[in-house]
Amino acid sequence: MNKSCIYPGTFDPITNGHMDVIKRACRVFDNVIVAVALNESKTPYFCYEERISLAKTATKDIPKVSVIGFDNLLVDLAKSKGINTVVRGLRAVSDFEYELQIGYANASLWSEFETVYFMPSLKNAFISSSIVRSVLKHGGDIGSLVPTNVLEEIKGKLC
């Protein structure tokens, strides 16, 4: 049986922490859809198109992964794809509190909806898009925080 999942997020930008979760999901699922959210409630550093492009570049060598953008409810996206499972990364207890609430909200919208949580490896547990943006803003080296194949694209931010 072919089992697929969706890994949603803003990916602003995609990080080595995200890649860690993607690779772990690929060990469990046959197909992983990385779904880049438009999320108008946030003010992204990278525009929507850039975030999709960065995610596609970062995952291009992982055959099980595809990247899409979405601007609707995650549950509606999942239903439209015939997928009832999403994966999320958990770095700390604070992540769990937030993700638990979101998971319950999604399950209340669709009873078949499941959320699977992955912990990143210790070397990536501290990495967040916020940290990458902060280091980038102050001219620091983000080379160990993001996939090498998107490093120059991130440094040459277009939007």
UniProtKB/Swiss-Prot annotation:
One of its GO terms (cellular component) is cytoplasm. It holds the Pfam family CTP_transf_like. It is found in: Cytoplasm. It comes from the Bacteria. Its cofactor is Mg(2+). InterPro entries: Cyt_trans-like, PPAT, Rossmann-like_a/b/a_fold. Pathway: Cofactor biosynthesis; coenzyme A biosynthesis; CoA from (R)-pantothenate: step 4/5. The keyword Lipid biosynthesis does not apply. It catalyses: (R)-4'-phosphopantetheine + ATP + H(+) = 3'-dephospho-CoA + diphosphate. One of its GO terms (biological process) is coenzyme A biosynthetic process. GO terms for molecular function: ATP binding; pantetheine-phosphate adenylyltransferase activity. ATP binds at residues 10-11, 18, 89-91, 99, 124-130. Its main location: cytoplasm. Disulfide bonds: none annotated. Signal peptide: none annotated. The keyword Transferase applies. The record marks 18 as: Transition state stabilizer. Substrate binds at residues 10, 42, 74, 88. Reversibly transfers an adenylyl group from ATP to 4'-phosphopantetheine, yielding dephospho-CoA (dPCoA) and pyrophosphate. Belongs to the bacterial CoaD family. This is Phosphopantetheine adenylyltransferase. The gene is coaD.
